[in-house]
Each structure stands twice: as C-alpha cells, then as structure tokens.
C-alpha cells in the first residue's frame, strides 16, 4: 500500500434532468458498456412510471427507496488464530449508497417484466413499500450481522 498521499474522490457531475448527484451515480450503476444515454432513458422512464403510480415527486420517492434499501451494518471476514470469523462492522455512508443502488439494479435485472424501465419501476415500487428482492437482501445482511454480534469485539 503506497504511503504517499491520499487520492481524493472524483466529483461526480449531477444528472442533466433533475440536477441530483445521487441520481447521476445511479445512472452510472445502471449503465452497461458505457452507454449512458440508454441508462438515462431507462432510469427516467422508470421514474416516470413510478411517479405515475405513486403520485409523488420523483426524487423524493427515489430517496425514500434508497433509505429502505441502505444497509447499516454488514459482516466482514476476519481471520483470528486459524479460524475465520464474520465480524459485523458499520457501513460507511458512501458504501451504503453504492450497495443500495447495486442491490436495486441487480434485483430489477432478475425480474420478469418486459423492459428494464418497467422492471426497475416495479422493483422501486416494491422497495418503497419495504418489500421486494433488494429490501430482502438488506434484511439478510442485517440478519447475518445480528447473528454474528458475538464477534463484534474483533473489529479493526
């Protein structure tokens, strides 16, 4: 590990339609093979479907959805004296957002609707009601951390 200077994180430009950095990050998560225009079309389409069904502001609903998916704790493997323990650790805020977005997109990709916009909108709708695959993933991670609470003193 280099001991020189800490490299700062790049500043992400806000998305063109809503001016939200979080939404711009989500567009980058959805993007495949560098096709940003396609990713934007998918997300804006999903947000339109979501706004139509819920009747609320798009960004407000998006923030609520991410809040329902964000993990607070996760487990990390730690080797102590020949055995590996799953140690629960708190998740940093940037990683919370990244995991929530990744889980949301993964859950949407496994759904059965026709277009990706419809799949994403359906998964977002489920997440806003605290159900769906992405929320289940968060609950599984929390359950795993709760089960291994006894090893919390191995934290580093």
Swiss-Prot record:
PROSITE patterns with a match to the protein in the record:
RIBOSOMAL_S7 (PS00052)
InterPro entries linked to this entry:
Ribosomal_uS7, Ribosomal_uS7_bac/org-type, Ribosomal_uS7_CS, Ribosomal_uS7_dom, Ribosomal_uS7_dom_sf
What does the record give under GO molecular function? rRNA binding; structural constituent of ribosome; tRNA binding
The record's Gene Ontology biological-process terms are: translation
> What UniProt keywords are attached to this protein's entry?
Ribonucleoprotein, Ribosomal protein, RNA-binding, rRNA-binding, tRNA-binding
Which protein family is named in the record? Belongs to the universal ribosomal protein uS7 family.
User: Which PANTHER family would you find in this protein's record?
Assistant: RIBOSOMAL PROTEIN S7
Subunit arrangement? Part of the 30S ribosomal subunit. Contacts proteins S9 and S11.
Name-wise, this protein is Small ribosomal subunit protein uS7
What is the scientific name of the source organism?
Idiomarina loihiensis (strain ATCC BAA-735 / DSM 15497 / L2-TR)
